[in-house]
Amino acid sequence: MPALFEWDAEKDEANRLKHGVGFREAQLAFLDPQREIAEDTGHADIERRYFCFGVVGGRVMTVRFTLRGESIRIFGAGYWRKGRRLYEERRRIHG
């Protein structure tokens, strides 16, 4: 997986105001050794989109992203119940 991150500054600010999470902080979800990556099949009309579920500050963060060349392009992040539930279910399965 690429190790460079990028994002739109205006989307970052909008996400921070709406969900209380900036994209710089969202990068930390990828550092969780037990993170889970899942394809977002519901919103992949033009390009493939993914979710990263990882623990940041003791809570499960969901990061929405796509791959652009050698970069991970973040376009959404937050602490959502559905993301936490999916992360916990996958941890039980993969253990």
Sequence positions of predicted segments:
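Ribonuclease/tRNase effector modules and their secretory precursors
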Residues: 1-95
